């Protein structure tokens, strides 16, 4: 009896003195606990992101609850600011973000080309092949790009359901839409530039349609929030190239904001994430990336942050399967690959901006 007591006491002592086993998903590598233990020694992960802190809040809370002792230092900024800050810090050789998470897919991939660590996430088998680039950069979301409009001021019969319909509507009612249409300023917004280029690739008549839209005077902004606010207030009537995730979240509490998914083609954006090579918190960075891609993390994004999941096994309709059932063949995902880099070449970028400014009358 005494010996049994001693054995039990020893077992209890060992259990209490050993690190707690983390609650990571089944199917992860057998040595993944070493990554967890390493992350706890590092104590934090620094994330540079274009996803605002409020939207990312539930994800951060879920991560810190899953991995106690690993804090998330979350820095949100617009895509241009993120790119410039990261480049400057890397050039100076100082500390920077452990993880980059950006909606500007092209500039994120450009950064990944030079600065990403190679890491084969155990979650990559759950992702579409187009969302994984060289085990370095990962697409993390599945977000349709939409039109928004003011429900009070745009009759239901006038709501455009394609890019052609949008251009025809505005060109036929230039007085009504004079300075009432908004989109991104592609010179100030990295996301705006990338989406415009993707429109150009998808639509041979893109610049002609843009010129028709701009006949009444196009209002350009650098943020989605400003565009939604101005359409809701009536200062603008229609906005295009808006992230559907932000629009759907806003529309839940704003009955004035309408959303139209174009039926000719609907671009699908995927926020790109990568781990910085040689970063001080490499284990914590791996935990964060894996958590974002995991069923748990994706469920939080889809059902709490209103950001559609890139997986197809998430409860509810806010994932790839749900979007496919709603929009079918119109969906046009933007792949995470080298094609994103083409118009970041200086000569091509400048020439493209010149064409855009001519068509947009800017």
Where are these regions (language model features)?
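Bacterial N-terminal signal peptides that target proteins for export
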Residues: 1-9
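Sec/Tat signal peptide C-region and signal peptidase I cleavage site
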Residues: 18-22
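Conserved C-terminal helix/tail region of periplasmic/extracytoplasmic solute-binding proteins
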Residues: 28, 332-362
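Mature extracytoplasmic/periplasmic domains
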Residues: 271, 276-337
């Amino acid at each position: 009896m005494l010996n049994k007591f001693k054995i039990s006491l020893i077992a209890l002592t060992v259990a209490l003195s050993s690190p707690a086993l983390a609650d990571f998903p089944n199917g992860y590598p057998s040595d993944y606990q070493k990554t967890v233990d390493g992350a706890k020694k590092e104590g934090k992960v620094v994330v540079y992101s274009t996803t605002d802190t409020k939207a990312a809040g539930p994800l951060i809370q879920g991560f810190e609850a899953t991995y106690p002792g690993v804090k998330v230092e979350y820095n949100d900024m617009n895509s241009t600011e993120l790119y410039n800050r990261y480049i400057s810090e890397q050039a100076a050789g100082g500390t920077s973000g452990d993880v980059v998470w950006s909606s500007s897919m092209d500039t994120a991939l450009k950064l990944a080309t030079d600065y990403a660590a190679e890491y084969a996430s155990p979650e990559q088998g759950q992702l579409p092949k187009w969302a994984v680039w060289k085990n370095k950069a990962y697409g993390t979301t599945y977000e349709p790009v939409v039109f928004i409009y003011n429900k009070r001021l745009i009759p239901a019969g006038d709501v455009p359901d394609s890019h052609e319909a949008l251009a025809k509507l505005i060109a036929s009612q230039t007085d009504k839409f004079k300075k009432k249409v908004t989109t991104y300023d592609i010179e100030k917004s990295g996301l705006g530039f990338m989406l415009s280029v993707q429109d150009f690739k998808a639509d041979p008549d893109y610049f002609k349609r843009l010129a028709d839209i701009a006949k009444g005077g196009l209002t350009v902004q650098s943020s989605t929030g400003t565009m939604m606010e101005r359409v809701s207030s009536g200062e603008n009537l229609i906005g295009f190239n808006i992230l559907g995730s932000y629009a759907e979240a806003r529309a839940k509490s704003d009955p004035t904001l309408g959303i139209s998914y174009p039926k000719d083609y609907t671009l699908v954006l995927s926020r790109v994430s990568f781990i910085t090579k040689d970063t001080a918190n490499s284990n914590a960075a791996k935990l964060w990336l894996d958590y974002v891609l995991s069923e748990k993390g994706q469920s939080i994004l889809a059902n709490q942050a209103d950001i559609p999941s890139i997986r197809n096994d998430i409860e509810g309709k806010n994932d790839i399967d749900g979007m496919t059932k709603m929009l079918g063949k119109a969906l046009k995902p933007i792949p995470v690959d080298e094609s994103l880099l083409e118009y970041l070449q200086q000569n091509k970028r400048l020439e493209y901006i010149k064409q855009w400014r001519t068509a947009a009358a800017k």
